[in-house]
Amino acid sequence: MIEDFHLTPLSANADAADLLEALGPLDDSPAESQYCVFRSGRERFCLPVLDVEEVLDWPLLTKVPLAPPYLLGIFNLRGVIVPLIDIALTEGRRPGLLPKHVVVASLRGEAGHDDLRVGIAADEVIGTYSVTTEDLLEQAPENVPHCIGMLRHEDRLALLIDLRKLLEVYPGPSI
C-alpha cells in the first residue's frame, strides 16, 4: 500500500554511507530461489526456473537411428531441433508407457556459442515453487551423477538437476 512507502530526503552532498543509513537495516531473511518440480518415472526432479524454457505436451517425435535407449527422439520447437531424453529409463519405466510432458531446458552458451536445449520427459509437472536455501540439501545420491543436490518439497525430496552434468551423462545426437 502507498501508506507503507516512506521517502527520506537526503542532502545534496550525501554519500553512499548516508544512503545506506537512510535505507535502514537490510532484510536478513534467507534468500529464495524458484524451481520447477516434475516427476519422471518414480522420482521427482527439479530445475531452477531460469534453466526452464517451457513445458510442452508430448510432441511429435522423430526417432534417431542407432540412438542410445535414453534418447527417445528429436522434435522441432519453432525451427530448433531439440533432443528428448528419458532420465527415468534407468529406473525401469514400464515399456510402452509414454510420458505426458516435456520440460525444455536451456543451457546458456558461452560467448560466441548458441544455447543448448534439451527436452526432458516428464510424467507429471508438479509446479514451480519458491524455496529458501534451507530447503536445499547439498548431497545427492552418488548413483545419480547428473544431480547436484536435493530439494525438500511437500515432505518429499526432489533431485536437483545440473544441466551440464546431465548433458555429459546423456549426450544428445550431433545435429
Model-based region annotation:
Residues M1-I175:
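An acidic, low-aromatic, low-complexity terminal/linker signal
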